[in-house]
Amino acid sequence: MSRIIGLIGGMSWESTATYYREINELVRTRRGGLASADLLLRSVDFEAIVALQKAGRWDLAEAALAEAASGLVRAGAGCILICTNTMHLVADGVARSIPVPLIHIVDVVGQDLVAAGIRRPLLLATRYTMEQTFYRDRLRARFGLEALVPDADDRGSVHDIIFDELCCGVVKETSRRRYVEVIEAAAARGADAVILGCTEIGLLIHQTDSNLPVFDSTKLHARAAVDFSDGSLQVDAVAA
């Protein structure tokens, strides 16, 4: 089996850059010297994907990502990562279109939450991820977790900061404080951890900003990619 990592990125490229850095830093830490990751990146046009999201054309978005995944497999990728939480709404369809494992970001996050004894994490993400049930349903079905989401006003703030600022590389202290308010409100409702369930949120929020344990989906997904590449990942546990 090929151990080349295949990344579908560009959604946004700000977080794809984090994936690339995290994966290569982990490889260098584990192997030492000048070691770097053997990977392939297919970066899509995020503007086109966002237009499909807004139009509710998830079928066309799935087709676009399936085509990207197939191209990576033809180029030699032994696994596929969709480098965005929101587009895991179509992950099962993409997984069915390829003969190699798709490392599902929700499974990677769920495994770490369970290992840490978390039961009621707060999910911070785009409005699509927070309001549609694919993410929370998978956490519940596979890991017995009951994820909370913010109230409607807070969901709007979280979503707008992602698209208007973080996806454009803009990090504001006022937005950090707004996210902290959302986290504190969720803690008062019984949340026992925070999922950074959009790959850009880690640009803004860190463990030092929260009294609750923070689980950064980007870093966890990147680690799973390296685990796959060095043979330590149980592929069946994360394949869709």
What are the residue ranges of the model-derived segments?
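Non-catalytic structural scaffold of enzyme domains
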Residues: 1-240
